[in-house]
C-alpha cells in the first residue's frame, strides 16, 4: 500500500473511534415525569422495570407495565406500598426460579 492509502485508513479509523461516545439522542433525561404513590396489585403487572440512577437521571425509576392495555406507570420508590410490592415480586420470582 502506498502512504496515502495508509493515511486515509488511519484518518477513517480515528474518526470512527471518536464517534463512539456521542449520544444518539439529544433529549437525555429521566424517563418518569410524574410518579404514583398508589399501591399496585402484583397480579395486574405484566412487567416491572427498575432503572438505577445514572449520569442522565439522579433518581431510581420504577416503571410498571400493566397487563390490561399495556399502560405504563412510574412508581415512587420511596413509597411504603411500592417497597412492599417490590418485596412481593422478588419473593414470587424466587419461588419460580430453581
Curated annotation (Swiss-Prot):
What is the name attached to this protein's record? Answer: C-X-C motif chemokine 10
Q: Please spell out the taxonomic lineage of the organism that makes this protein.
A: Eukaryota, Metazoa, Chordata, Craniata, Vertebrata
Q: Which Gene3D superfamilies match?
A: 2.40.50.40
Q: Name one GO biological process term.
A: chemokine-mediated signaling pathway
User: What does the UniProt entry say about where the protein is found?
Assistant: Secreted
Q: Which gene encodes it?
A: CXCL10
Q: Where is the signal peptide?
A: 1-21
Q: Which residues carry this modification: Citrulline?
A: 26
Source organism: Macaca mulatta
**Cellular component per GO?**
extracellular space
GO-annotated molecular function: chemokine activity; CXCR chemokine receptor binding; CXCR3 chemokine receptor binding
Superkingdom: Eukaryota
What is its biological role?
A: Chemotactic for monocytes and T-lymphocytes. Binds to CXCR3.
Amino acid at each position: 500500500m502506498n502512504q496515502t492509502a495508509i493515511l486515509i485508513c488511519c484518518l477513517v479509523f480515528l474518526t470512527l473511534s471518536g464517534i463512539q461516545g456521542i449520544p444518539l439522542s439529544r433529549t437525555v433525561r429521566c424517563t418518569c415525569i410524574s410518579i404514583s404513590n398508589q399501591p399496585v396489585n402484583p397480579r395486574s403487572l405484566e412487567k416491572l422495570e427498575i432503572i438505577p440512577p445514572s449520569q442522565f437521571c439522579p433518581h431510581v425509576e420504577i416503571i410498571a407495565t400493566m397487563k390490561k392495555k399495556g399502560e405504563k406507570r412510574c412508581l415512587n420508590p420511596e413509597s411504603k406500598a411500592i417497597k412492599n410490592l417490590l418485596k412481593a415480586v422478588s419473593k414470587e420470582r424466587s419461588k419460580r426460579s430453581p
